């Protein structure tokens, strides 16, 4: 069966139900839900204009149905490390980019994997820049705050992050 724009076989299986068309959005939604992101998908998909910065496996972390930019797009290897060289610089970038959410894929950050980025996320939470933390199967979605958050709330959020986020395990790799 011919299944691609190049008229080659084998890329996508044809199903008569959809007359040969492939619903890539449904496929990505199923793949993301398999990784434990059902409610996170639903939240960010409420508005296709939502802007998300994703700390996750590239390019799969870009598949949410909104405006997603990976952390790698912003910093090394493809971006400008000056944008994230301090929490203040990253906050400035998020304000400039009108970022709504930050997403952290379960098992992506931790000792041996993007440690500096993990410390940056912790600092953003401690400073109150990320609020309304939501966890699903070790994945995290946090709202970027444009208002000052009380120190006690920020500390509670940081403790919740340490407890609920599923960190990268180098020994399991």
Feature roles, as predicted:
Residues 1-5, 64-67:
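Short aromatic-enriched loop/helix-cap "lid" or pocket-rim segments at secondary-structure transitions
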Residues 2-42, 59:
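Membrane-proximal, lumen/periplasm-facing interface regions of secretory-pathway glyco-
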Residues 16-19, 45-47, 53-96, 111-128:
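Extracytoplasmic
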Residues 26-28, 90, 120-121, 161:
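Generic structural signal of hydrophobic/aromatic residues within well-ordered alpha-helices
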Residues 32-35, 54-58, 104-108:
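Structural motif
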Residues 51-52, 101:
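Beta-sheet entry/capping signal
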Residues 100-173:
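Aromatic/acidic, Gly/Pro-rich catalytic loop(s) in extracytoplasmic/lumenal soluble domains
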